[in-house]
Each structure stands twice: as C-alpha cells, then as structure tokens.
Design a protein with these regions (language model features):
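Entry/N-cap segments of selected transmembrane alpha helices
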Residues: 1-5, 17-49, 163-194
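Alpha-helical membrane segments and immediately flanking helix-loop junctions
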Residues: 34, 47, 51-98, 197-212
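Structural signature of hydrophobic alpha-helical transmembrane segments
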Residues: 1-9, 55-69, 114-128, 173-185
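Loop-centered beta-sheet repeat module
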Residues: 90-136
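Small-residue-rich segments of transmembrane alpha-helices in multi-pass membrane proteins
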Residues: 5, 9, 31-45, 93-105, ...
Length: 212
C-alpha cells in the first residue's frame, strides 16, 4: 500500500505549492537535484571505469542509486520546520528523487540502464492535480496544507515498515561507507550549490539523504 500512500502524499504536496513561488521553488529544487545527479554520475563513472567497479566494496550502481535518490518525506519535514516558503515549494521538484525516476535518468546517463517516461508521468500527475485544485480553490489549499504534517508521518511510517534492521548488519562496513558518501560528500555539494544560488543551505542539507 505504500504506492497509494506516496501518491496521496504527492497530491497533498501539490496542494501546498503556490503558482507565485513556483519559479523560485523550481530553481531551488532543480539545483539541488541536478547537483545530486551530477555528483552521483561522476563518482559512479570513476568507480565503474577507473576502479574496476569496486570502491571498498561499493559498485557504481550502488553509488549512483543511493546518491541520486533522496528521502523526500525527511526533506519535507526538515524544510517545513527550518526552511522558507521557497524551500517548501521545492518539494514539488525534489519529490522526483523519491522513486526510481531520477536514479534511472542518472543510470541511463552513465550507460548502466534505460529510462521509461511512463513512470515519471505517474509521479507528476497527482502532484499537478493537487497544485491546480489548491490554486483554484483556497478551501482545498487550506485542507491540504493543514494535512501536510500528518501525511509526512503516515508515509514515513509506511516506508519504515518496509525496512529491516538486519539490513544494517548485512550492509556492513560498505553500507556505512555508502551512507557517509551520500550524506557528507553529496551533502557538501548540495549545500554549496544551494547557497550559491541564493538559498540558505537548509534545502541542500535536507536533501542529503537516500531513498529507503
């Protein structure tokens, strides 16, 4: 049922986005997502082409898959408390990092996989519907905005139920190293580009995670 919950989450997120803040939000969201993708591709190519697809137990596929994705529920929660309106509006762009869409684009760019546009459209549609309805009807916008925190909790709980603590031990040192690379290396670049384009760095830090 996580797929349906994520769809509802997208609908709610769309309802919090104002058409007026869309250009600035799209710029901020696009900046940090493109940074994640670019860094993941560069590191993936280095590992895949120069290090024989093995960097301390990490493959190019693992690095690209982890670095190009993000936990958007975590992003939404962090920017809701510490970010500004533009950071929150950028959720409409960063939501693309939740599923395999951005990751598949990154893998396709590095020649490791192909990409289907159908899965991308499936994500954008509920987001657009929520955005349009909320901007046309103020009452709908208020309902969806008030439900933002609840939707983050529900989606986070559902995704958490699909995880297993044993995966931490199975991943071992390589898994820990991958987490460090995603958070510290990837985060350093997303925070830098966020500040470089007029942000506070909160959005860049909030996106420095990987999708569960």
């Amino acid at each position: 049922g996580s797929g349906a919950l994520v769809g509802a989450f997208l609908f709610v997120i769309g309802g919090t986005i104002s058409f007026k803040s869309t250009p600035a939000a799209a710029k901020r969201g696009g900046t940090i997502i493109l940074t994640k993708v670019a860094i993941s591709i560069i590191l993936g190519l280095i590992v895949g082409k120069l290090l024989n697809d093995n960097f301390l137990g990490l493959s190019a596929l693992a690095i690209i898959g982890a670095m190009s994705g993000a936990n958007n529920a975590m992003y939404a929660g962090i920017v809701h408390d510490f970010g500004d309106e533009v950071d929150e509006g950028a959720v409409g762009i960063t939501i693309l990092s939740v599923g395999p869409y951005v990751t598949m684009i990154a893998l396709a760019s590095s020649g490791l996989a192909s990409f289907s546009i159908v899965t991308l459209l499936a994500t954008i549609l509920p987001l657009l519907v929520g955005m349009i309805l909320a901007n046309l009807f103020p009452a709908v916008k208020k309902i969806l905005t008030d439900g933002m925190n609840a939707s983050i909790v529900v989606v986070g709980f559902a995704l958490g139920c699909s995880m297993n603590f044993s995966q931490i031990f199975i991943g071992g040192a390589s898994g820990i190293l991958l987490g460090v690379v995603v958070t510290l290396v990837g985060g350093a670049f997303t925070i830098w580009t966020d500040k470089l384009t007029g942000g506070s760095g909160v959005a860049g830090a909030a996106i420095s995670s990987t999708a569960g």
